[in-house]
């Protein structure tokens, strides 16, 4: 078969992805990711390029969780050979955690390929992944929906006049990065000179616009989102979900006050291990009132829905000077390193095992593509949940 013949696959039908025939069990599940240390980096990229890529241990953990449910799991690198690997494997569904290989919408690359080839996949679609990566666009959508955000301005050239709506101190970061890339102690800006220097550095170093917003001095929280309106029909543990179809996770608070970058939860702070000095403090569940906890959860779900995110995400918020929470950003491909990534630690704090979390994401995705019927799961079973409240700090990394 010629190398370009993969373009001919699935030409026998013009039906949309949701009408793929239900596969015989077990499923062939391809875990698609960018492997840290093996994914090529741009020659002119920043020092923290590749920070979002996954380690071998994370990929193995996901594959093992899927295989434990009776399915066959395979790792496929998200590189230029992915189309041919998909042709050869012909998976029933893909578990996508790929960050992409550059560009303004790199996190949408793999979903776009899978949709072109009509292969089902987990989590958010092309558009939602593209929007979530572009923090400026995300904020514009949230603002249009009436959701609380900090005042902001995007700098494309660095010489634009500062908006009259913005007042020092300000906070600057790359508009299209994650994992705290481009964020350190110099991200907080107090003068016009600092603003020009920082914005110019971001544009030059990251080859993208700089997002400048009002600095939020209050507490920082991370909220996990899992589910959708009809999740209760497809989950083997319907009691996980509320009437709106979403599970309410414990709230995780990030305390960077004594971190390596005091008050700033940036890239360096996110790469530290438990044994390193300057590790931020993490409290899960956070010590918040029921009223505030409910508000944070409602905002997270609203932010998730506003950009069209699907099944799973992680939403970051910070309190302003008046003690009101404001949305910072959303991650539609949240880290899934067991015992380490925020979402995994949040889930574990209430008795949801790593295996359960991975299988919930898998089955939510499969049900969207009609790969299973409501309440027909064969051997799949969520472990019995025993929520527990953990008051001590838990050190994690995204």
Predicted regions mapped to residue ranges:
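Active-site nucleotide/adenylate-binding loops and adjacent lid/helix of ATP-dependent enzymes
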Residues: 2-33, 83, 87-90, 129-222, ...
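Short glycine-enriched, charge-decorated loop/helix-capping segments at active-site entrances
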Residues: 45-51, 184-189, 344-346
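ATP-binding N-terminal substructure of ATP-dependent carboxylate-amine bond-forming enzymes
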Residues: 1-121, 126-127, 132-133, 156-162, ...
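Phosphate-binding site of ATP-dependent enzymes
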Residues: 24, 192-298, 324-326
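A short beta-strand motif that forms the metal-chelation/ATP-contact edge
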Residues: 29, 93-95, 222-227, 323-338
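Hydrophobic beta-strand scaffold residues
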Residues: 73, 120-121, 149, 170, ...
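ATP-dependent carboxylate activation and anion-phosphoryl transfer catalytic cores
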Residues: 2-17, 141-143, 287-398
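Short acidic/His/Gly/Ser-rich catalytic and metal-binding motifs that mark active-site loops
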Residues: 38-42, 178-181, 274-276, 337-338
């Amino acid at each position: 078969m010629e190398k370009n013949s993969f373009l001919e696959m699935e030409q026998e039908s013009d039906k949309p992805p949701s009408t793929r025939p239900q596969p015989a069990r077990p499923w062939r599940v391809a875990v698609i990711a960018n492997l840290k240390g093996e994914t090529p980096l741009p020659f002119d990229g920043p020092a923290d390029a590749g920070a979002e890529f996954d380690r071998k241990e994370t990929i193995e953990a996901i594959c093992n969780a899927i295989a434990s449910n009776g399915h066959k799991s395979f790792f496929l690198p998200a590189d230029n050979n992915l189309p041919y690997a998909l042709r050869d494997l012909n998976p029933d569904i893909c578990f996508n955690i790929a960050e992409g290989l550059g560009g303004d919408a790199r996190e949408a690359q793999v979903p776009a390929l899978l949709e072109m080839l009509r292969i089902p996949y987990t989590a958010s679609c092309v558009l939602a992944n593209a929007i979530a990566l572009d923090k400026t666009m995300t904020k514009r959508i949230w603002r249009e929906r009436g959701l609380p955000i900090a005042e902001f301005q995007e700098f494309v050239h660095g010489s634009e006049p500062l908006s009259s709506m913005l007042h020092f101190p300000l906070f600057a970061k790359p508009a299209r990065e994650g994992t705290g890339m481009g964020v350190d102690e110099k991200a907080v800006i107090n003068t016009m000179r600092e603003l020009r220097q920082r914005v110019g550095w971001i544009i030059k170093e990251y080859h993208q616009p700089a997002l400048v917003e009002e600095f939020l001095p209050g507490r920082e929280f991370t909220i996990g989102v899992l589910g959708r309106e009809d999740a209760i029909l497809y989950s083997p543990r319907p009691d996980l979900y509320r009437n709106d179809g979403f599970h309410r996770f414990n709230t995780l608070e990030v305390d960077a006050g004594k971190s390596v970058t005091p008050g700033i939860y940036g890239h360096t702070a996110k790469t530290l291990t438990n044994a390193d000095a300057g590790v931020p403090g993490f409290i899960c569940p956070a010590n918040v009132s029921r009223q505030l906890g409910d508000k944070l959860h409602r905002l997270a779900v609203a932010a998730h829905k506003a950009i069209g995110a699907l099944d799973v995400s992680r939403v970051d918020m910070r309190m302003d000077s008046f003690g009101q929470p404001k949305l910072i950003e959303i991650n539609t491909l949240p880290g899934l390193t067991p015992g380490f990534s925020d979402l995994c630690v949040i889930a574990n704090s209430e008795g949801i095992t790593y295996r359960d979390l991975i299988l919930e994401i898998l089955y939510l995705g499969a049900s969207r593509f009609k790969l299973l019927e409501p309440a027909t799961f064969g051997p799949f079973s969520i472990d019995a949940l025993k929520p527990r409240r953990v008051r001590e700090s838990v050190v994690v990394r995204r």
